Amino acid sequence: MPRSRALILGVLALTTMLSLCGGEDDIEADHVGTYGISVYQSPGDIGQYTFEFDGDELFYVDLDKKETVWMLPEFGQLASFDPQGGLQNIAVVKHNLGVLTKRSNSTPATNEAPQATVFPKSPVLLGQPNTLICFVDNIFPPVINITWLRNSKSVADGVYETSFFVNRDYSFHKLSYLTFIPSDDDIYDCKVEHWGLEEPVLKHWEPEIPAPMSELTETVVCALGLSVGLVGIVVGTIFIIQGLRSGGTSRHPGPL
């Protein structure tokens, strides 16, 4: 990716508005909804309009298809959102972006180096379907490529990626999911490309399979188990004999 590429974010306008109204730290509430997060950037004409609740995405507006996409279909049965509202907000942000670009003399945004972590959704069992999660944080500007590799080859099937989520410092984070079946023959990498990185970053993951016991270890374990069993038999026999003896001496002849 060309790092010299000029990029001014429409989110800067959003940042200004949020700063005037008070930061997220000023809010004291059991639940927080973040409505109408609008991001537009150029060149590339890339935008995003999302709604979040307690840090989780409720829906986003597909700007190409001009429709609302709910994260869970059930949400769409309980509420509705006209995608035209999101498209209008994006149009406003796009206009503001043009104004800011001229005022800044097309100054590029500062690129931050993102950080990535890979982990499984559930405890890993070989042969059992699971999901790998690549969590990428500290993204700015919100332009990034996340690619899954299996045995160094790109994987496209079973991949799902979220929208960008806004952090408190106005950087972003994003998650990429890969459904897979764990095998001791496969290794996986999450490849992250961003303007803040001098070269792509690979986060490696492979299933942790316990090493097989050696013959000596198996022999020691068997011998230990046998010894414990024999000790138990001996101790049990002693207790039985003592019980019989104490029972015999406690008997006294009754009256004639």
Curated annotation (Swiss-Prot):
Parts of the chain that traverse the membrane: 219-244
Principal localisation: membrane
Top-rank lineage group of the source organism: Eukaryota
Location in or out of the cell: Membrane
SUPFAM superfamilies reported in the protein's UniProt record: Immunoglobulin, MHC antigen-recognition domain
Location of the Ig-like C1-type domain: 114-206
GO molecular function: peptide antigen binding
Parts of the chain on the Extracellular side: 24-218
Family matches, as InterPro entries: Ig-like_dom (IPR007110), Ig-like_dom_sf (IPR036179), Ig-like_fold (IPR013783), Ig/MHC_CS (IPR003006), Ig_C1-set (IPR003597), MHC/Immunoglobulin (IPR050160), MHC_I/II-like_Ag-recog (IPR011162), MHC_II_a/b_N (IPR014745)
Membrane topology qualifier: Single-pass type I membrane protein
Segments of this protein annotated with the region Connecting peptide: 206-218
UniProt entry keywords in alphabetical sequence: Adaptive immunity, Disulfide bond, Glycoprotein, Immunity, Membrane, MHC II, Signal, Transmembrane, Transmembrane helix
Ranges where the record places region Alpha-1: 24-111
Glycosites: N145
UniProt keyword Signal, yes or no: yes
Signal peptide span: 1-23
Disulfide bond entries: C134-C190
Pfam families listed in its UniProt record: C1-set, MHC_II_alpha
Positions in the Cytoplasmic compartment: 245-256
PANTHER family for this protein: HLA CLASS II HISTOCOMPATIBILITY ANTIGEN, DQ ALPHA 1 CHAIN, MHC CLASS II-RELATED
Similarity comment: Belongs to the MHC class II family.
Protein name in the entry: H-2 class II histocompatibility antigen, A-B alpha chain
